[in-house]
């Protein structure tokens, strides 16, 4: 850098200033639009807050800086190259660029040749667009941009997660159909990290957060061996991923679920060989580095609906409901899943109910009340007693 504030703080290339907070967030609140970038950065390298040992990020010792460059992305990429950036996370998606896709691809290729590993979520457009345009720019760029699709906690594909392949038929690129995405990560029911360092359960959905998991994994790998190039990273992370869908590479989850532990071990194994050291302790499988997919899915058949973010002055707030409370029933119907909620709400409409009985649980305490038809005033999330990883 040149010693100016952007070296550590980042830069807004659209406004040509250092303002990266475009939407203010009041203390004690969560604004999904305002904190989208904050959450992405937290997933990559968040370290929690003072006095709280909980580390939120995948690579908590990594350093990050932000850029805003919707209109001047070339300047942002050039700046990242000059700053010596290792990886560059892009949780946005642009449709319908036509021939201009070639320009994006060329810029990303140049950045990749300069050593930057570009990462993006696969997009959230499976229910809105057809293949091969579910994945848009930049996640549709081959080789230079790595895309992460999304799975739920039970490893089923998230319905909105965009699928490949993509297609390239421009004046400059004639690849035809190209396999995408590269891998997948969790993208549904993720915890929120608030500005004060506290967390709220299961409040985030979207491939905007699968991409940063990919980016964090790459940062972790680079901490083990900073000399790796983008194509090395891609080969290692795809070869160590855990297959969670159709056998082999597929258009929904790519090579499979990112396995950070195995990826870093493979990095250390290759590094040991390159340095003429014994790679033995990094070779082979270990207990805990393999997922028992069938066993975990069986345990995850039992779920509950927990309260995520509570809307101020909404029906749930007026009843005194807090994040973490469990919705037991709605309209006298048991609610243990999102589908249960949908069925119960449809039945309430069919019954033309003017008042709907709701039951919540907070520990041993039961909270009963009545809702009017309409928004419940909280974001429901699915929780399980079993951890995903053992």
Short names for language-model regions:
Residues 40, 88, 217, 316, ...:
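Terminal peptide-recognition signature
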Residues 123, 261-283:
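Secreted peptidase-domain scaffold signal
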Residues 47-51, 64-144, 177-178, 195-211:
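Substrate-binding/access-modulating region of protease and related hydrolase catalytic domains
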Residues 2-3, 16, 136-223:
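Extracellular S/T/G-rich loop segment that most often corresponds to the catalytic His/Ser-adjacent loop
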Residues 1-72, 113, 140-145, 154, ...:
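Subtilisin-like serine protease catalytic core
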């Amino acid at each position: 850098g040149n010693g100016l504030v952007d070296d550590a703080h980042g830069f807004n290339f659209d406004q040509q200033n250092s303002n990266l907070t475009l939407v203010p967030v009041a203390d004690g609140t969560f604004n999904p639009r305002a904190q989208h970038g904050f959450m992405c950065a937290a997933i990559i390298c968040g370290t929690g807050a003072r006095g709280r040992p909980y580390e939120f990020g995948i690579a908590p010792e990594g350093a990050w800086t932000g850029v805003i460059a919707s209109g001047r992305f070339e300047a942002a990429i050039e700046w990242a190259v000059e700053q010596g950036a290792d990886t560059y996370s892009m949780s946005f998606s642009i449709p319908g660029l036509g021939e201009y896709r070639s320009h994006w691809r060329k810029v990303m290729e140049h950045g990749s040749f300069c050593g930057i590993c570009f990462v993006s979520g696969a997009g959230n457009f499976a229910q809105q667009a057809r293949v091969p345009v579910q994945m848009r720019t930049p996640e549709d760029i081959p080789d230079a941009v790595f895309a992460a699709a999304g799975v739920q906690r039970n490893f089923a594909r998230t319905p909105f997660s965009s699928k490949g392949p993509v297609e390239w038929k421009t004046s400059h690129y004639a690849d035809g159909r190209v396999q995408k995405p590269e891998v997948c990560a969790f993208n549904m029911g993720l915890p929120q990290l608030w500005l004060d360092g506290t967390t709220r359960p299961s409040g985030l959905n979207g491939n905007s957060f699968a991409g940063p998991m990919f980016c964090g994994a790459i940062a972790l790998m680079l901490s083990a061996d900073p000399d790796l190039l983008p194509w090395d990273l891609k080969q290692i992370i795809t070869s160590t991923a855990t297959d969670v869908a159709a056998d082999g590479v597929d258009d929904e989850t790519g090579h499979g679920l990112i396995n950070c532990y195995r990826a870093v071990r493979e990095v250390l194994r290759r590094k040991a060989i390159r340095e003429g050291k014994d790679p033995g302790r990094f070779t082979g499988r270990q207990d805990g580095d393999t997922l028992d997919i069938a066993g975990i899915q069986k345990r995850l058949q039992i779920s509950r609906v927990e309260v995520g973010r509570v809307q101020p002055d909404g029906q749930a707030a007026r009843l005194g409901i807090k994040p973490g409370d469990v919705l037991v029933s709605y309209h006298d119907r048991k609610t243990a899943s999102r589908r249960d909620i949908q069925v119960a709400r449809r039945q309430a409409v069919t019954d033309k109910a003017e008042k709907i009985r709701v039951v919540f649980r907070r520990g041993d305490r039961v909270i009963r009340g009545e809702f009017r038809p309409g928004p419940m005033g909280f974001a429901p999330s699915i929780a399980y007693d079993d951890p995903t990883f053992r």
